[in-house]
């Protein structure tokens, strides 16, 4: 069912897009050291292809300095938007989601935030105690609950309906069907909601 048709017949609200950019500042000497270790067993012909892919991996996206900038940008955008409702931040990995949670939680003006990921207790460390995904789902679906921002990587991107969710921050490459499913989280009708916003 095409999105434009669902908007035209009033089933959903339009989705608006706002492009934002937090650049990756990569130190080539560190990339090359890690890269050389990883591709030592690979044929020489594939090294150039692998080198291009290596530059965009989770490690670079999840650098502390970049996460600080993204967290500040998300919180600043969230508290200065004119929309009422809730927001979702989509990250590349559980590690990044957990790190982003710790950063945002410490910010003075940040909304109440939670991280919703699957994983074992050892991996998630201290935030696991705060995680109860069923309870978080109940809270996030309640428009009156102060929980305003959730950080996810894969969970809640499909089949999760929260009509008052109106902003999605994408910090993860998505494409095709997965992208369409994810951005459709913000186009549900709710009271006087005029549209959903995807910030990338």
Label for each model-derived stretch:
Residues 1-84, 101:
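Interdomain helical connector at the RecA1-RecA2 junction of SF1/SF2 helicase-like NTPases
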Residues 31-33, 103-108, 127-130, 165-168, ...:
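Short secondary-structure boundary/capping segments
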Residues 1, 9-15, 84-85, 109-112, ...:
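Short glycine-/polar-rich loops that comprise or flank the Walker A/P-loop
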Residues 151-165, 184-189:
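SF2 helicase motor core recognition
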Residues 146, 179, 183-200:
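Conserved segment of the helicase C-terminal RecA-like domain
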Residues 21-26, 94-96, 120-122, 156-158, ...:
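Conserved nucleotide-binding/hydrolysis micro-motifs of P-loop NTPases
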Residues 51-152:
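Conserved C-terminal RecA-like helicase domain
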């Amino acid at each position: 069912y095409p999105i434009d048709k669902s908007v035209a017949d009033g089933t959903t609200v339009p989705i608006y897009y706002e492009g934002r950019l937090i650049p990756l500042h990569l130190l080539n000497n560190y990339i090359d050291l890690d890269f050389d270790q990883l591709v030592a067993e690979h044929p020489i012909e594939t090294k150039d292809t692998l080198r291009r892919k290596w530059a965009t991996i989770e490690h670079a996206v999840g650098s502390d300095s970049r996460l600080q900038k993204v967290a500040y940008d998300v919180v600043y955008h969230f508290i200065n938007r004119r929309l009422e409702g809730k927001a979702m931040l989509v990250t590349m990995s559980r590690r990044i989601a957990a790190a982003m949670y710790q950063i945002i939680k410490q910010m003075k003006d940040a909304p109440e935030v939670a991280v919703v990921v699957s994983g074992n207790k050892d991996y998630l460390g201290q935030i696991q105690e705060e995680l109860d995904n069923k309870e978080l789902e109940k809270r996030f679906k309640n428009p009156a609950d102060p929980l305003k921002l959730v950080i996810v990587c894969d969970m809640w991107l499909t089949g999760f309906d929260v009509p008052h969710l109106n902003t999605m921050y994408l910090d993860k490459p998505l494409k095709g069907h997965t992208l369409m499913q994810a951005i459709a989280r913000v186009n549900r009708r709710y009271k006087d909601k005029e549209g959903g916003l995807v910030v990338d």
